[in-house]
């Protein structure tokens, strides 16, 4: 037991965390919650009013990220005023990029930490608490938040709490950071260069989760297919090697990975779609634009034809591959012809649920110095046209699933009905269907009967579990 753990906790309330952004931030927030529960006995609560500690885990990828942080902190002022002993912290990518600004503009904030220093939270909190009892001559110190936005890389993973399952599906961070330096992207400046966790550490986490009942793992990274983890023998394992190892873990029957870069889709990784049945027939592979000219300005270092060739290779192995992507609309210099090339690529590739955004300059990136010469009304029109096409494709794929039998991992009770359970298909569709709670954690076959905007409705197909359920329903009549 650490010195902090051995002392009486200074907190009697709970912990409130608000998370913006990507799945990596969700993973980080989960690890923060477990770390602070272990250190201080803090349990997560639903509202700031219930909390002794309020944490904001931020994202700086999209427009007005900094303003969102200060807007939220403005709303938190009343909670600090009502209970001055509350600890307020800001973490994540905005903290990494704007730490000093936050310290100057938001005196209610006690601690500021980056994505790679969240493991130091307990020590930072202790320092912040100590400042509150500082002598009169140290009053100036009281006005300063404790800040640590450095990049210690792997140290973060070495010092976090043991992984604990929150369900039958789990995120596992295998690498962080980015070394691609696309001209529009702030990630290399907020999360640092790419670094990979050692192979044995990743496997130990997955094996621990499997013993706790996890059936599906989602391998995470800003460029997850750039994973290069050192093995015990000194050799380096790439993502393909890791996937083969994960499939051998008892209890793990479904594997996902996200997010990927087209340049890291190696042949060995593509071969996994033929060799690893546990790997889902779904791939999230951002391209950002269908125009080679725009891709060059973005410094993506690949052409549209290379991207399409990669998808075709995988679809030869998995014809049912579900593809999603990311698109940026209105990048500086984008012409109507460039945008038409994006629409043509989307039409050809047939995307299943994708993300599209209007370009906004991110501070400190090379593209921020370019003239933002695409008028806003034009950006909005292009975005509307792209999203209409993407939504049409997604709806058609959902409708095409009606009448098919899908393998579903049952995750929880349905929010729609107490008689239903909810799970996900390989292409990440939520399916609700009648079934007992005992099915949670099981893979079952479900006949899809109806398609809605955000979910599917189905019927349990004959399995031993389904037969038992149907018998109970019959005798209940």
Swiss-Prot record:
[4Fe-4S] cluster 1 binds at residues 22, 59, 93. Residues 399-462 form the TRAM domain. It is found in: Cytoplasm. This is tRNA-2-methylthio-N(6)-dimethylallyladenosine synthase. Binds 2 [4Fe-4S] clusters. One cluster is coordinated with 3 cysteines and an exchangeable S-adenosyl-L-methionine. Monomer. Its EC number is 2.8.4.3. Keywords: 4Fe-4S, Cytoplasm, Iron, Iron-sulfur, Metal-binding, S-adenosyl-L-methionine, Transferase, tRNA processing.
């Amino acid at each position: 037991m650490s010195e902090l753990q051995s002392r009486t906790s200074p907190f009697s309330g709970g912990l409130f965390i608000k998370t913006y952004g990507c799945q990596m931030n969700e993973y980080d927030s989960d690890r923060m919650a477990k770390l602070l529960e272990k250190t201080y006995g803090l349990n997560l609560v639903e509202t700031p009013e219930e909390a002794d500690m309020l944490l904001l885990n931020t994202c700086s990828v999209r427009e007005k990220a900094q303003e969102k942080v200060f807007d939220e902190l403005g709303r938190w002022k009343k909670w600090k005023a009502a209970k001055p002993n509350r600890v307020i912290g800001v973490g994540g990518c905005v903290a990494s990029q704007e730490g000093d600004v936050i310290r100057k503009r938001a005196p209610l904030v006690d601690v500021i930490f980056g994505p790679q220093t969240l493991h130091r939270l307990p020590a930072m909190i202790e320092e912040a608490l100590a400042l509150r009892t500082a002598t009169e001559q140290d009053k100036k110190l009281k006005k300063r938040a404790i800040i640590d936005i450095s990049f210690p890389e792997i140290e973060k993973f070495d010092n976090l709490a043991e992984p604990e399952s929150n369900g039958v599906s789990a995120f596992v961070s295998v690498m962080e950071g980015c070394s691609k330096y696309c001209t529009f992207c702030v990630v290399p400046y907020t999360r640092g260069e790419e670094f990979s966790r050692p192979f044995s550490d990743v496997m130990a986490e997955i094996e621990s989760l499997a013993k706790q009942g996890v059936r599906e793992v989602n391998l995470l990274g800003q460029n997850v297919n750039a994973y290069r983890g050192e093995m015990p023998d000194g050799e380096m394992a790439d993502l393909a090697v890791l996937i083969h190892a994960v499939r051998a873990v008892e209890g793990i029957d479904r594997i996902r990975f996200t997010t990927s870069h087209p340049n890291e889709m190696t042949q060995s990784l593509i071969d996994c779609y033929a060799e690893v049945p546990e790997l889902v027939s779904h791939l999230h592979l951002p391209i950002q634009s269908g125009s080679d000219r725009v891709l060059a300005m973005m410094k993506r270092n690949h052409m549209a034809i290379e991207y399409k060739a990669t998808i075709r290779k995988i679809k030869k192995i998995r014809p049912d591959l579900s593809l999603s992507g990311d698109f940026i609309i209105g990048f500086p210099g984008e012409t109507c012809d460039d945008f038409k090339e994006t629409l043509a690529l989307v039409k050809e590739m047939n995307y299943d649920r994708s993300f599209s955004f209007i370009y906004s300059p991110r501070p400190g990136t090379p593209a921020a110095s370019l003239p933002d010469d695409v008028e806003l009304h034009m950006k909005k029109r292009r975005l509307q046209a792209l999203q209409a096409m993407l939504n049409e494709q997604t709806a058609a794929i959902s409708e095409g699933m009606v009448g098919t039998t899908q393998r579903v991992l049952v995750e929880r009770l349905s929010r729609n009905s107490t008689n239903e359970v909810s799970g996900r298909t390989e292409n990440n569709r939520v399916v609700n269907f009648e079934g007992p709670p005992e099915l949670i954690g099981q893979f079952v076959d479900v006949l899809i009967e109806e398609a809605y905007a955000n979910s599917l409705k189905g019927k349990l197909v004959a399995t031993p579990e389904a037969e038992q359920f149907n018998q109970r329903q019959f005798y209940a009549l």
